[in-house]
């Protein structure tokens, strides 16, 4: 009788698992939206309710006593401290880096990832990063040639913990002792620093944007560039001092977009940081003031608000938008593959379960279509000419210029694109000593050094087509359809140590890199006109000081209140001195 009752309980507890899909598969049916359960004093038992009920009944029927030491080890495990949803979804997931040696290996790996619907995080000429569940690793290796079965290294083996670390929450006592988490000594001191100390959800970003437009109404306007599939507005900040009277020539406009892919949080934070830096320096810096007088700057923090919200509420690593497809359990369209120019989704990305699914026709991705319509309206009816386009993504630290759809088509302004691209990479190197490779988007898997050595050779085919070039990109559409003179896709930090889960202490350093990119971009566009005015562009560049770098684990931070007050005074004195020096140089 006991045995029969136990079997029945096991069957009941297993009903919810009948339709389960392995954690490494991209066709996992999305769970219902509910707030993330962050750490608290509640129980850390990660077992599902039915599992806990089953275990208790079996323990009482068979008289099994609880092993206190076992439960203590689970409670003390760093993995058990992750949010319950992250642990359930990604508890067994890892990120592997495969080292490629030839095109045959790349082709075999690409085919295997397509067959298993794996999530390719990044691809270069030397390696490919892939996320998958541990139980899927044998299946993947079985599809690969012998040379690749040992040619990989674990890149991330604590994915759930790293996901948890990206959320803005107070870490529990003892969690900072884990080697994967390094606290920062320098506390945030100003309003802007406090805002950029953590990643922010859309429910915080939108009111912040309204606040900026209200506080700085002379040169900031909050607009919407469209509406998402789920009905959310796609907010943007327009910076500039366009006069009330009609201008004789179209107003030159630069568009900066982030968050096309929902999980790339650093792109959204970087767009906001760059906008904030320009907003607060207007009227104080001759250089920034000149940029806002000569151009309109439109900053779109997240083109994919539905997907961004979903990464906060359900799945941190969601990439696409939330639009339904022909397969109800595989929603979403890749917004950077959905644009009309050279769209090739029917030929290369026709599977709705693919992370790169481009839809059934051009502009089926609603948010991409909305941005395109807004841009066309700006140029046709709002007396604007979009002269610059910066599309921020992550990760791999690359500055990419057109074309993305093919390496056989050479952009007519190639030399200018390369010249400015190299200048942008140089200013980043001067800012934080980080190296960004510069190449065409179709050769995104070929490093700048390779390109320099083979500049006179025919264009190369990307070694890993799954993560390489493609048609239907926003980059190509703005450059070709709108005749945007300078269009770039910038893949932000890092090179793989954290991937899409870049810790929040790198928000400000990455933001400084792109703020300096924007200054250099504007300086380049101003061109010869700037020679008539004494502008010191270098004085405005933001640099990351040594004390702003993440601290080592042995550092002892000062008490929070004392440190903040002291830092406030130091920052104000430094700002005043720098302004005085700048004014002295101008005179």
Swiss-Prot record:
Gene Ontology molecular-function annotations: zinc ion binding
Major subcellular site: other
Ranges of residues in domain Peptidase M14: 198-525
Residues with attached carbohydrate: 377
Keyword Secreted among record annotations: yes
Localization annotation: Vacuole; Secreted
Domain of life according to the entry: Eukaryota
Pfam families: Peptidase_M14
GO cellular component term of the entry, any: extracellular region
Cofactor(s) essential for the protein: Zn(2+)
Record GO biological process: cell wall organization; proteolysis
InterPro entries tied to this protein: M14A-like_propep, Peptidase_M14
The entry's keywords: Cell wall biogenesis/degradation, Disulfide bond, Glycoprotein, Metal-binding, Secreted, Signal, Vacuole, Zinc
Family: Belongs to the peptidase M14 family.
UniProt name for this protein: Inactive metallocarboxypeptidase ecm14
Record organism: Neosartorya fischeri (strain ATCC 1020 / DSM 3700 / CBS 544.65 / FGSC A1164 / JCM 1740 / NRRL 181 / WB 181) (Aspergillus fischerianus)
